[in-house]
Amino acid sequence: PYGRPITLGDTRVSFHPAGHVLGSAQIRVEDPDGVWVVTGDYKRAADPTCAPFEVVPCDVFITEATFGLPVFRHSAPAAEIDKLLRSVALFPERAHLVGAYSLGKAQRVIALLREAGYDAPIYLHGAMEKITQYYESRGIALGELRPVKGVKKADLAGTITLAPPSATSDLWTRRFPDPVTAFASGWMRVRARARQRGVELP
């Protein structure tokens, strides 16, 4: 559990929420020489699908910095969701296909859509089904979700489907009526990346 220390000789180790995905953690290590905190991915923004990032006082903070450059100034999540929902309303004859990582990002997008009042079924690529079911088993409410496999092309008009990023540029997308492609990633702040992936709604 978060915050419960483990003693190893004269060293105390504890795990603390990283706010990245369900169960993600920073590791706090304390010994007579000081306190270190080591973390991989973490997120300070609010996320309805996981425990919030905890600021852990320390002498040394060891982190990665994927989005450390000034170009990465992320928009408010609610604004990005609003952009998606406005596009769905504007193009009811088209399917909206959102590329998102299967662990964490997909579930966050779903939860943010629900917070914005979107209560229609959301369709999932098969690769996302099990991990999303696990989130639900841990008490994360995500509303009505359906597998996209086997759904008729015409029935996907006006819907939102989440799929792994690799699927959005694959033959798999041919099952959708004139899809609008989006990608839920901070990398879309780099325009060349968005163009490279053929993203219509970055």
What kind of feature is each model-predicted range?
Residues 1-100, 104, 115-116:
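His/Asp/Glu-rich metal-coordinating catalytic cores
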Residues 3-8, 22, 129-131, 152-155, ...:
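A short acidic, often aromatic-flanked loop/helix-cap motif at beta-alpha or helix-coil junctions
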Residues 10-17, 135-141, 197:
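Short, surface-exposed amphipathic charged segments that create phosphate/polyanion-binding patches used
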Residues 35-36, 59-61, 95, 121, ...:
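Structural motif
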Residues 42-44, 66-68, 126-129, 185-189:
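Short, acidic/turn-prone active-site loops that include or flank metal/cofactor-
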Residues 47-49, 71-73, 130-138, 154-156, ...:
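Short, charged, surface-exposed secondary-structure boundary motifs
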Residues 81-96, 100-162:
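Hard-cation-handling environments
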Residues 139-140, 147-202:
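C-terminal regulatory/interaction regions
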